[in-house]
Structure formats: structure tokens, C-alpha cells
Amino acid sequence: MAEVSEEIRNLAARHQEFQRQAEALRQEMSMVQASIASCDQAIATINELKAASEAGRAAETMVPVGFGSYVYAEVKNPDKVVVNLGAGFSAEETAEAAVETLNRRKEQLTKILEQMNASLTKIAQGMQALETEAAKIQPGQA
């Protein structure tokens, strides 16, 4: 009986570790999803500003000035965009090149998210296997 109890405790500890891994992975996935949404928003904004300019309308936007405050501003040159390249570096690109850069980054993030989903599935399968094993050890307790 002590063997069974020890084995159940071992399975429970492994299950809890899987749960911790799954939660950490879900949090990371949430950050990646937020980055994908940010790419989508940047692409849409660049395209809208460029379309407004091409149609002869003022390309207006709101610029953050700090502490949740914004000012309205007119974009003088929506054909030029400064894009974050990573590691603290940025570069000025044409609107088209900026959209391409953002689309590439979005594709990379989407692949990462798919890999994370696959990892989460493996963790869930591992948890299920532990639950099945525990049910075999204690059929009346499952």
C-alpha cells in the first residue's frame, strides 16, 4: 500500500510540473499573440495613412505624449516609416518595405506560436498519460 501511495505522489508531482510548464507556455503564447496583433495594427495604420495621403486627404493620427495623453497630428510623409529591427536598432523604410518587414515578422511569430501550440499539446498528452496511469493504480479513486 505504501508503494502505491508513493507512486501516486510521484505521479501527482510530475502532473503539477506539467501544469506549471503549461501555464508558463500559455503566458508566453499570450505575449506572442499580442505581438502578432501589434504587427497587424501597425500594418493597418501604415496602409490607412498611405491611402489617405494618396487620396489627397490629410493623413491624421494621434500621437502619445505620455501618461495616457495624446495629441492630434498630421503625418507629413506617410511614405517613410521608422521600423524597429530588434536589439534596439531601427531603420527608416518606405511604407511598402515597412509593411513587408512587419509581414515577415508576423510570419515568424506565427510559426513560433504554432511551435508553442505543438508543445502545449505534448504537455497535455503527458498530463493525460499521467492521469491514465494514476487511474490504473487506483481504479476506485479516479
From Swiss-Prot:
Which GO molecular function, any one, fits this protein according to its record? unfolded protein binding
State where the protein is found: Cytoplasm
Q: Specify one Pfam family.
A: Prefoldin
GO cellular component, alphabetical, reads: cytoplasm; prefoldin complex
Q: Superkingdom of this entry's organism?
A: Archaea
- The signal peptide annotation in the UniProt record is none
**Primary place of residence?**
cytoplasm
According to its UniProt entry, the protein's GO biological process terms are: protein folding
Relate the protein's function as given in its record: Molecular chaperone capable of stabilizing a range of proteins. Seems to fulfill an ATP-independent, HSP70-like function in archaeal de novo protein folding.
Q: Which PANTHER family match?
A: PREFOLDIN SUBUNIT 5, PREFOLDIN SUBUNIT ALPHA 2
The record's family statement is: Belongs to the prefoldin subunit alpha family.
Stated name of the protein: Prefoldin subunit alpha
This chain's source organism reads Methanosarcina mazei (strain ATCC BAA-159 / DSM 3647 / Goe1 / Go1 / JCM 11833 / OCM 88)
Q: Which gene encodes it?
A: pfdA
